Amino acid sequence: MNVIHTTLPVGATAPFTIIHLSDTHLTYADLRDGQRKVDLIDWRLPSFPNAEKVLAEAGELSRELNAPIFHTGDLIDYVSLANLEAVKAFTDTHDVYMATGNHEFSLYVGEAKEDAAYRNQSLPAVQACFGNNIRMDSRVVNGVNFVALDNGYYLFEPEQFEFLKGEVGKGLPMVLMMHTPLYDPKFYERMMSYCPCAYLMGVPEELMVGYPPDRYIQQKADEVTLEMMEYIAKEPLIKYILTGHQHFDFESVYAERVPQIETGIETARVIEFV
């Protein structure tokens, strides 16, 4: 496991530390979910061979530093009884605050259109594994409000926008946690240098012309999403965004104002807020 140390000034009432993880992608399955689910292991495990080891080491680091784990999604690669049991065992013994990714609700990885109806098939079972509301929640630590939002499907929803406005009303400095990074030219260029699409939220349509048709549909922002992104860009209480999804460590600046920090697939980012 790679460990990165980052210090972020935010106006905390006292310094504190969190461990930022993302994209662990546990790949447990057994015959309780049928052979099709078991077959996913051979396909998916080679992409995430160290997931179990990384999570265990992050857990030990959390205990050593007495620091909570703030996870920005894809802790599991797909929904299975074995994966959910592993997650529940971990969250029962560690302080974990979660912002979900798209894979938290993935049944067989890419077999169907991912939308609210698809997500809701497994939402209750996944939610039962975590102590916070995995669709939207807030947690205040030493005067800093960490707002977790589920944007795994490249969209914000109206209730999330209203929730965010309510959190702004608390008047505290805020750190947003979400799985999918928001569009930034630097991030876009990095992704498009080797991918057919950027896998970012809110990419301007003129920059999506060359996307594969299915990825264009998947990643096209709607009106609510664009409005909420503009709100985030302009709200001075929002100080940082913690993200994942792209599987590498990266730092950019959203809307030329908000530092956006991505933590990669086998990294534990130890962040001290001051």
Model-flagged regions — what are they?
Residues 6-10, 80-175, 198-202, 251-273:
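Extended active-site neighborhood of metal-dependent phosphoesterases/phosphodiesterases
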Residues 13-36, 105-106, 177-200:
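Short, solvent-exposed beta-strand-terminating loops
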Residues 18-20, 70, 146-148, 175-177, ...:
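Structural motif
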Residues 22-53, 106-130, 186, 217:
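Acidic/histidine-rich helix-loop elements
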Residues 23, 73-74, 101-102, 179, ...:
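Active-site glycine-centered loops adjacent to acidic/histidine catalytic or metal-binding residues
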Residues 57-68, 154-253:
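His/acidic metal-ligating clusters that form di-metal
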